Amino acid sequence: MRHIGAIVLGLLLGACGGAGSVSAPSVTPQPSAPASAAVVATPAPTYSPKAEGFTSKVLVEKPREVATSAAGFAWIAAGTSTVGKGVTATVSEKESFTASYETPIDRQAADAKQAIYLTPDLPPLAAGRYTESLRLVVVQAGGRSSAHMHSGIEGVLVLEGQVLVRSGGNAPASLVTGQGFFILPKVPVQLINVGSGVARTLVYSISPEGAPFSTELTESP
């Protein structure tokens, strides 16, 4: 928070000369009251942890084996995979996408190079069986998701509109069409539509097999 110090204004008053031999009394300048400007903090908007005007649809879901525990990254690309990796889904007549989770060495692969959104390198997933999925999320104007957290990693691409992402331990982020974000396991998150129209996001997730996709929370992040 910036603080604006008081600005002190000084006024200089001059003495006036009188008629004949009678001199006018001198006037002692009186300092004016200090003028100050105060900056008042605007409280951040608060949101109910309950969902409103929100729908989520599973487009595709399939098992995935992670053979070794290593750092990785998620990517989302338009169209289908050139090498058959990841999960692919059609969102609309003009929109289809593929997404996957790979190790950093795969950043040079054709799919990753053509990606619309790539996450940075993420903490390692434990070796084991997982479920990969793509979901289409639609949030009406003024709507929001519930406050929740995930059992796995999410990579999210904004397909339409403007959204505000609030997550535990991070500053709120406003994103528009074509931008993306990621969420690590067990991090509280809430998605709010701050645009004037409908917002759509494509959600790629890789979650431990058998674990709940998400868990609702009673408090907003």
Name each model-derived stretch:
Residues L12-A15:
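C-terminal motif of bacterial Sec signal peptides marking the signal peptidase cleavage site
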Residues L59-A99, V139, S167-K186:
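Short acidic-glycine-tyrosine-enriched beta hairpin
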Residues V22-S48, T215-P221:
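Ser/Thr-rich, Proline-interspersed low-complexity disordered segments
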Residues G86-A110, P185-P212:
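Ligand-binding loop in jelly-roll beta-barrel domains
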Residues V39-A74, D111-R144, Y204:
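A short glycine-rich, His/Asp/Glu-containing loop-to-beta-strand
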Residues G17-G20:
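Bacterial signal peptide processing site
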